[in-house]
């Protein structure tokens, strides 16, 4: 009878877990569809447009052609060896899904919809992987909580909403699956689990440059266990299998190549691999000789190996056989390094330090359950707990110095918070007791009800907060911006697509477009036109050329752009409707990057006022007002307002017609409805041999043209 009841209870628990997990999977997907419901099925932001373009190339061509793809429509005139400079995991996975749906199941689905819905689908897989990982750390109840947290937590949703077709859409899934198999392998010594961890590590390497995090975290875990005296044959078989298979497999990715054995980023893994061989040998020798001799041999051996390792690594790095640390790595330890030495890295908003409120905004009450969970793991310090603690400490620091690394911190916050909350529920939701003194005291029951009820209420607030943040903050595609009319109605600002469509329909197919690198992928993806620079940022000098053109006087800019066969110049201007992400706000980064290459020609100080202010009104410096970007941004802007005095709603400064010098070398050919995107065409040389400035002055003196300008009806800022 008892066994039957136990069997029925076990079946019921299994069914209940399945139902809960189906609900979690549904919540993970549905919460990421706000962008499609509010806007449409569209690729978001910047990098996803390149990934989408590359995926289309893959499905229209063979995988061989994809790996050997040379793109002559980017980085003109240099081009880009695209197939050998990208992580193909995202594109190949999408192409496989598209092929399976279209050719195996006969569904006439477009590749764009596969790309748009890719991230929500894999978020469900992430929830499963987090469940399995947390179950290895504590138990199934903690695993379900962790899965529920990761399914809707804003810190992960920010990079996995529908349309966010970026590498992180699949990378966090692979991160958690790799860690799950690693913990299983470390606990059991299973070569199969270690092999699975290595294969998913290879998959991770193919999908995201952040694979280096795994490359260093797993060796750190092994190193800490060795220092704690917890070496075992299980640990040896798990790590050596993972490292050997994972390293060889990762070297098959063209973009990675020999980096695992020739880069400082990977040397920790190699060093721990060598160390664990020595420890294994020492463990064998320990049984053959006396303890005193063993200690002497081990101390001498470790000292010699440490010295030889440091000297060898330094020598190989000096000789160029091992690549030094990258600029992004240095910027993690010195937050001013990139700003001083590599401004192109510092100019990326994702590389800025995170503000403290962002931790609560992205994780809600999980952020204060997080340290409690880590503390509980310290109390019961198992080998797998050491991994979570190391993960927590490292990512807590890294997320504090770089915004984008909040994404890697979020999973361990969910895991640790689930451990803490599960422990609380284990105690306060257990209403069965054999102790009579608790049974006769209603205060104990009341305490349990209050504590458990409070945390259930916090869970409700967490769901409410996560839904609100997802809907309002993380579901905008950035190429279409939501705003409001003066009467409060929703208005969609579609200037980006309007401008790119104009370029696509009104310019020659081989036209070259100069714009700041932020918009290169979008121009290539939506306008299908050749660009000088894009978001790949592999050539700092080429980016500096565009920055120099924007910062130079008009005549000099014209010559620079003409040398590079540019036909059109595209600038983003937000002064009319209050869009703060425009080129004027990014202008100082353009100046700093170009100053790093041409310090004698471009000086940041020249763009400030005598008082050291960055201004765009009548008090702006002459260098600022004569720069090409200033002229293109503010051309005809004051004439929009009665009396000729316009207010830049981003900088909150007054602009008059006298503040804006005329343009003589460029023709305005397009300005979007809300003046966010402005496109100019380089003028042809004068047929009579006159300079374009002389022609412009003659035209202004002989005629006075009036332009009919319509102001948009948007009354609120973006």
From Swiss-Prot:
Named cofactor requirement(s): Mg(2+); Mn(2+)
Enzymatic reactions: a di-trans,poly-cis-dolichyl diphosphooligosaccharide + L-asparaginyl-[protein] = N(4)-(oligosaccharide-(1->4)-N-acetyl-beta-D-glucosaminyl-(1->4)-N-acetyl-beta-D-glucosaminyl)-L-asparaginyl-[protein] + a di-trans,poly-cis-dolichyl diphosphate + H(+)
Protein's GO biological process: post-translational protein modification; protein N-linked glycosylation; protein N-linked glycosylation via asparagine
Phenotype for residue 163 to R: Temperature sensitive and staurosporine sensitive
Short motif DXD motif 2, span: 166-168
Record membrane topology: Multi-pass membrane protein
Binding site for dolichyl diphosphooligosaccharide: 404, 521
Spans within the Lumenal topological domain: 31-118, 158-168, 206-210, 259-266, 323-355, 402-405, 465-718
Keyword Cytoplasm: no
Variant or mutagenesis effect after changing residue 210 to D: Temperature sensitive and staurosporine sensitive
Location(s), subcellular: Endoplasmic reticulum membrane
Residue numbers covered by motif DXD motif 1: 45-47
Note: Present with 3000 molecules/cell in log phase SD medium.
Quaternary structure, from the entry: Component of the oligosaccharyltransferase (OST) complex, which appears to exist in two assemblies comprising OST1, OST2, OST4, OST5, STT3, SWP1, WPB1, and either OST3 or OST6. OST assembly occurs through the formation of 3 subcomplexes. Subcomplex 1 contains OST1 and OST5, subcomplex 2 contains STT3, OST3, and OST4, and subcomplex 3 contains OST2, WBP1, and SWP1. Interacts with SEC61.
Name this protein carries in UniProt: Dolichyl-diphosphooligosaccharide--protein glycosyltransferase subunit STT3
Organism, scientific name: Saccharomyces cerevisiae (strain ATCC 204508 / S288c) (Baker's yeast)
